[in-house]
Amino acid sequence: MFKFVMVFAVLGVAAAGVAHVPHPQVSHPVGRSEDVHAEVKSEHSDVRADGFDADLLVSNSIQQASSGDVHGNIHGSFSWISPEGEHVEIKYVADENGYQPVGAVLPTPPPIPEAIARAVAWLEAHPQAPEPVHHSHH
């Protein structure tokens, strides 16, 4: 019983010590000074039985627009001015294939090597027949 009490006492002290560890304050410079006082310049939303349309314009040049249909497909875009002063825009589709963003600032995968592309095309043109399943009775 004494060991049992000691184990829980040690665990309690350890947990209390972890709870009082100070967390350093980290400053994250984000955005621009005018972002702090940004105001909504226009906002519109129209929700209907067959879908919706919505858009937003903020005084610091942030914009958002989207529309959706009754099947859950959404098309939209959002944009802002980067800290470097560049206009950044992302267009997207969200549907049964997932979220598909497109924009110049997004990374793109390298091209598929020609040999791999030929191999994939050959495999698609020559599908393998399923192998028969053999059951052995013992």
UniProtKB/Swiss-Prot annotation:
<feature type="signal peptide">
    <location>
        <begin position="1"/>
        <end position="16"/>
    </location>
</feature>
<keyword id="KW-0732">Signal</keyword>
<feature type="domain" description="Chitin-binding type R&amp;R">
    <location>
        <begin position="49"/>
        <end position="110"/>
    </location>
</feature>
<dbReference type="GO" id="GO:0008010">
    <property type="term" value="F:structural constituent of chitin-based larval cuticle"/>
</dbReference>
<dbReference type="Pfam" id="PF00379">
    <property type="entry name" value="Chitin_bind_4"/>
</dbReference>
<keyword id="KW-0193">Cuticle</keyword>
<dbReference type="InterPro" id="IPR050468">
    <property type="entry name" value="Cuticle_Struct_Prot"/>
</dbReference>
<comment type="function">
    <text>Component of the larval cuticle.</text>
</comment>
<dbReference type="InterPro" id="IPR031311">
    <property type="entry name" value="CHIT_BIND_RR_consensus"/>
</dbReference>
<dbReference type="InterPro" id="IPR000618">
    <property type="entry name" value="Insect_cuticle"/>
</dbReference>
<protein>
    <recommendedName>
        <fullName>Larval cuticle protein 1</fullName>
    </recommendedName>
</protein>
<dbReference type="GO" id="GO:0062129">
    <property type="term" value="C:chitin-based extracellular matrix"/>
</dbReference>
